A protein has these predicted regions:
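N-terminal low-complexity segments that are often proline-rich with Ser/Thr-Pro
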Residues: 1-33
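Conserved beta-strand -> loop -> alpha-helix junction used to position metal-binding or nucleic-acid-contacting
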Residues: 60-69, 74-113
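Amphipathic alpha-helical interaction elements
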Residues: 35, 52, 80, 97, ...
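Alpha-helical elements of the RecA-like P-loop NTPase motor core of helicases
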Residues: 41-44, 72-73, 144
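Intrinsically disordered, low-complexity cationic segments
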Residues: 5-8, 40, 90, 200
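Active-site beta-loop-alpha junctions of metal-dependent nucleic acid enzymes
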Residues: 34-56
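Acidic/histidine-rich catalytic cores and adjacent linkers
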Residues: 69, 118-242
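A generic short alpha-helical patch detector that favors 3-5-residue windows
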Residues: 35-39, 63, 85-88, 100-104, ...
Length: 242
């Protein structure tokens, strides 16, 4: 059973053949011919291909995504209400800070971090809304960035996922070490030849990265998350959108 999907389309490719049976980390989408998939239709096509290869679209899952609109729409259109989306909190913070002068970034960064550390959904949302209100007058673009998709950054709060596991699932960070190791392998290649060889080099990179894999934080609580997702009804897993 696959219960959690991490997607960060600015990362390296992860061939489907090397995915875990329980946890999927999707990097940059490549099709079978090695073509980079950044637009909606191609990302949607890849997800449909996963279904043809055995992925059950009717099973509720938690999808951890960055802020990319194409992958967000593709997941929604393919998996519908069974897709519970957790937007990456790290990407959200980074986007908000990009609209602020350097003198303001540290304070806002700390405030957002403390807000997301709240266990209860209402407390976290209240603090984030307060930050947005404080930014609205002087930095309206930063405030708008914070409010855009805010609910989806709080999916782990609404599910009441325990602390250690929540730290893992609140962002796309768990895939970064694997991506870094893969990039280290690919960086040595001066000529990929063709798309097939590009995929082979990517696979080799992730096999090398696998040697350094460790248990994720909160791994003992994964069964709790699985039960939470299995027990969700259609009405309770749907996250409001801004």
């Amino acid at each position: 059973m696959l219960f959690d999907v991490h997607c960060d389309h600015f990362s390296q490719p992860l061939p489907v053949e090397f995915l875990s049976s329980r946890l999927i980390y999707c990097g940059r989408f490549f099709n079978d011919y090695g073509g980079l998939l950044l637009d909606y239709h191609r990302q949607k096509g890849l997800l449909e291909d996963l279904i043809r290869r055995g992925l059950d679209p009717a099973r509720p899952r938690l999808y951890v995504l960055d802020g990319g609109k194409a992958i967000h729409k593709a997941v929604r259109d393919i998996f519908g209400k069974e897709a519970l989306i957790q937007r990456c909190q790290v990407h959200k913070k980074r986007n908000v800070l990009s609209y602020l002068p350097e003198s303001e970034q540290a304070n806002v960064s700390v405030a957002m971090t403390m807000a997301y550390r709240e266990f209860e959904y209402e407390a976290a949302k209240g603090k984030l809304m307060g930050i947005a209100n404080n930014l609205e007058y002087r930095y309206p673009k930063a405030a708008a960035s914070l409010l855009e998709g805010l609910e989806e950054t709080l999916a782990v709060h609404r599910l009441k996922i325990p602390g250690m596991l929540r730290e893992t699932l609140c962002s796309t960070n768990p895939m970064e070490s694997a991506n870094s190791a893969c990039r280290g392998i690919i960086r040595r290649v001066s000529n990929f030849g063709d798309g097939e060889m590009a995929l082979r080099h990517a696979a080799a990179g992730f096999i090398e990265a696998e040697r350094g894999f460790r248990r994720i934080k909160g791994y003992r609580q994964l069964t709790v998350l699985m039960a939470m997702l299995e027990n969700q009804t259609t009405g309770t897993i749907e996250i409001e959108t801004a």
